[in-house]
Amino acid sequence: MANQKKLQVTLRRSVHGRLQKHRQCVRGLGLRRMHQTVLVDDTPENRGMIRKVSYMLEVQEA
């Protein structure tokens, strides 16, 4: 699986005051702080979490 596609995900908006499930999705993607960027595998599970909190994220293909 070394050739699996990756997504570069950056947290652009704060999780304060958001729904608990949305905060859990952000945490599940490995994001802790604003403006932090992580690389995640392009899987249906990660795509679902990204879609749920897309208003807080910036996503690019890596």
Swiss-Prot record:
Belongs to the universal ribosomal protein uL30 family. This is Large ribosomal subunit protein uL30. HAMAP family: Ribosomal_uL30_B. Gene3D superfamilies: Ribosomal protein L30, ferredoxin-like fold domain (3.30.1390.20). It comes from Halorhodospira halophila (strain DSM 244 / SL1). Signal peptide: none annotated. The keyword Ribosomal protein applies. The keyword NAD does not apply.
